[in-house]
Each structure stands twice: as C-alpha cells, then as structure tokens.
Regions:
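Glycine-rich ThDP/TPP pyrophosphate-binding loop and its adjacent helix/strand module
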Residues: 1-140
Length: 142
C-alpha cells in the first residue's frame, strides 16, 4: 500500500447484512486483512467513544506524518436490521439487550451527568436539536 495517507475503517457490527460474520468468512479478526499487506492494523472497541477517538487520532497522526495507511477493525453493534425490510430475526432479544447495556451514546450521557459536565436538561436539548435537524434534512432530501 506504499505510504498512502489513508485510514481504512471496518465498521464491524458482527453481521454482513443478515448473516453473522462468523458464517461469511474464515477471518474473524478483520485486522488480519491489513496485516497481510504489512499495514499496521488494530482491533478497536467500537462501543467505547474514547477507544474509537484514540485509535482514529493515532491512525490519522501516522497518515499525516507520511507513515502510510492504517486499518482499524472497529467492533460495534447494529441494533436494528440491515434495512427497513429486515426484521432481524436472526438475533435473540438477549443478544440485542446485552449490547444495549454497552451503548456508547448512553455511556457518554452517564459520564457527563456523573462528572457534572452537563445536566439532564442540557442533554434533552441536544437530543431535541439533533432530531429537529435530522428530520429537517430528511424532508429537504425528499
């Protein structure tokens, strides 16, 4: 891959559409793909905002310094099906609930409340503003 200043990100949510990654490839550790190109490759806890931020910062710094590409296998979870027509019946309720307990957005909310960085009213306002902007974009796109 020469010394291209690229950060390759695999958003690994455990499923390829409706099929478990374990059933679609013999390479469970996607970071091995980058290693086969002699590229620094790392598994990242995608359920941790801090871990994702740190990994992207380091990979970006490598790219900026001309040290070449990096591959990040960011392990996260998709709560819903692949599309509107996918009811996600291939997963158990227990599996989904176990990941919801680790939800990165909820973890950040807890942290900012615990450290008194924000109050619940602030979080509610941020969420409301986001939803308004999100739905306005959807209306404009249509």
């Amino acid at each position: 891959m020469w010394k291209l200043p690229v950060v390759f990100i695999i958003e690994n949510n455990n499923y390829a559409m409706g099929t478990s990654v374990k059933r679609t490839t013999n390479v469970e550790d996607m970071s091995e793909i980058g290693k086969s190109y002699h590229m620094p490759s790392f598994v990242v806890d995608g359920m941790s905002v801090e871990s994702v931020h740190e990994a992207i910062e380091e990979a970006s710094a490598r790219a900026r310094k001309g040290e070449g590409p990096t591959l990040l296998d960011i392990r996260t979870y998709r709560y819903k099906g692949h599309s509107m027509s996918d009811p996600a019946k291939y997963r158990s309720k227990e599996e989904v609930e176990s990941y919801k307990d680790q939800d990165p957005i909820e973890q950040v909310k807890k942290m900012v409340l615990t450290k008194k960085i924000l109050k619940q009213d602030d979080i509610d306002t941020i969420e409301e503003d986001f939803l308004i902007k999100y739905f306005l974009k959807q209306i404009i796109i249509i």
